[in-house]
From Swiss-Prot:
Organism: Bos taurus
Primary localization: secreted
Lineage, uppermost ranks: Eukaryota, Metazoa, Chordata, Craniata, Vertebrata
Residues modified as 4-hydroxyproline: 78, 96, 165, 171
UniProt-annotated glycosylation sites, renumbered to this chain: 90
Protein name: Pulmonary surfactant-associated protein D
Low complexity bias (residue ranges): 165-191
Keyword Calcium included in the entry's annotation: yes
Gene this chain is encoded by: SFTPD
Amino acid sequence: MLLLPLSVLLLLTQPWRSLGAEMKIYSQKTMANACTLVMCSPPEDGLPGRDGRDGREGPRGEKGDPGSPGPAGRAGMPGPAGPIGLKGDNGSAGEPGPKGDTGPPGPPGMPGPAGREGPSGKQGSMGPPGTPGPKGDTGPKGGVGAPGIQGSPGPAGLKGERGAPGEPGAPGRAGAPGPAGAIGPQGPSGARGPPGLKGDRGTPGERGAKGESGLAEVNALRQRVGILEGQLQRLQNAFSQYKKAMLFPNGRSVGEKIFKTEGSEKTFQDAQQICTQAGGQLPSPRSAAENEALTQLATAQNKAAFLSMSDTRKEGTFIYPTGEPLVYSNWAPQEPNNDGGSENCVEIFPNGKWNDKVCGEQRLVICEF
C-alpha cells in the first residue's frame, strides 16, 4: 500500500516534459512485463511508478537451434606457403596432350660405321677442267747410263821432228874417162847414184796435242734425251688426264681402246654410220675387260646396245666386221637362237650378256675408237 503513494510523489516532483517521456518508457516496460513493479493487485486509477532496479540475471536458457548460415565472406589474403609435403603417389596417367612443336635440331651425333658400298651411280656431266697444279719438285738424279757410242777420231797430231840422217849410200859408178886435156876447173858433179839401203828408224817425234773427246757429244746427247723424256712424260700425263675428262661420264678406256656413247638409240645400220663418221666403229669386245667396260656404259644408260658382230654372211656364224671369227663371246643362256629367223645382229644387255637381235630395231649406240 505504501508503494502507490510513493510513486505518486515521485511523479509530481518530475518535470512535465520528462514525465511524458517517463510515461512512454514506463508504458513500454510495463507492457513487456506488467508484474515488474506491481505484483499483488491490478493498478487503480493512479499513475505508474518509476522503474525498479533490474533483477538478477536469470538462469541460462537452453541452446537454441542453429540459425541459417550467413552469406559467405570474401576470400582473405593467401597465407604463407606451408612446408613441402611428402611426395604423393603417382596419379593415373592422363590422356596424351596435343603434339608439341618440333624442337630445334640436336647436335650431330657420332658418325656411324661405314655402310656397304652401294652400286655405282650414273655418271654426271663432265666438269670444267681444273687449274694446272704447281710444278713438281726435281726428281732424284738418275743412275749412270749405258756407255755411249765411240766418238769420231780426233784431228792428226803435230808433225814430229825430223829423224837422224841415214847411212851414206854406196859410191856411184865411175864416169867415162874424158880426153886428156889440160887440167881444167873441176867439172860438175856426176849423176846421182842409186838410193842407198833404208836407214834405221828415227826416234819418235813429240806427242801431238790431245784431240777433242767424243764424250762431250755423248753427254750432250744424253742431256737432250733426258729433256725429251721429261717432255714425253708430261705429255703422257696431260693426255691421260685429257682422256679421262673426255671419257667422263659416258666413256670407258680399256688398254688402247676407248668406248664412248652419247645416249642415242639407232638401228644397226644407222649406228654403224654414226660411228664411222666419228672415226670409229661399233664395239667389238675381244676380252672380258672390254666386255665389262661396255657393260658399265649399258648399265649407266639402262639400255641394251648394239655390238659390231653379225651372221649375215653365214647363218649361225657370227664374225667381226673384218671377217675374223669371234675370239671372245658372252652369250646369254640358249643364245643365239635366231628367234623368228631374222636375228642377225648382236646386242649386249646391261648385265653384260649377249643376245642375237633383229638389226632393224633401235638400240643404244656405243662407238669404239
